[in-house]
Amino acid sequence: MKETYLSRDFRETAAQRFPSQAKELNAFFDARLHALLAENAEASKEKQYHLKRQILPGIAAYETLQRVMPKEEALQIVHGYVERLARTSHKQLATLLLIPGLYRLVPSVFVKSTRSVFGPAAGFDPKELQVGNGIWRVDMMKCPYHDTCTEYGCPELCRSFCDSDDISYTGLHPKLIWERSMTLGRGNDRCDFCMKVR
C-alpha cells in the first residue's frame, strides 16, 4: 500500500523520538495496518478511500505509539499529524479563493463532494437540509470515521478528524461562513455542517 501522510508522519516520529526502537515500531505499525486493511477488505470502494487514506493508518499509528508513550500523548501526536495536513489544506484553499468571485462556488462544490465522496456508498448518511443559493447545510447522521474508530475501541481518535474540518474550512474567505456546533466524534448525535456565502 502506498504511504499516506499519517504513515509518513508516524515513521518520522519513530525515527526522531525512538531511534533505537524505530525498526520495531515500524514493523508493528505495518503489521497492524495490514491486519486492519484485511479486516476491512470487503468494504466498498468508496469507503476504502477513507479507510486507506486516513482512518486505518490513524488507528495503526495511535495503537503503535501507545507501546512507547501514554495514550493521551499518542492521541495528541496523531492529532498533530491530522492538524498539520488540515493547516496545509486551509492555506491552499485560501490561496485559491483569492481568485475574485470564486468563493461563491464553495457551497455548491461542497454539495457535489458530499454526494460523491461522503455519501451512503462510503458509509456516511447525509441529510441535506438546505443546498443551493450559496448555502450547503447537511446533517451527517452516520460517519465511517466515527463508526470505525468506535469499532476499534478508540472513539476519541475521531475528534482529530472532526477538528481537521474546522481547521481546514474556518476563515477561508471573508465572505464564507463555516459553521458546525455538533459532531458524532465529539459525542453528539450528528454532525451539523454548514458552509454559506455571507
Language-model features: locations:
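Generic detection of intrinsically disordered/low-complexity segments and helix-coil linkers/edges
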Residues: T4, A22-K23, Q130, D163, ...
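Amphipathic interaction/junction segments at domain boundaries or subunit interfaces
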Residues: R53, T64-G153, L157
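Unusually extended, aromatic-enriched hydrophobic runs near protein termini
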Residues: K47, L97-G123, G171-K196
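Secondary-structure boundary/capping signal
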Residues: A22, E73, L176-I177
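N-terminal, charged low-complexity regulatory/assembly segments
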Residues: M1-L65
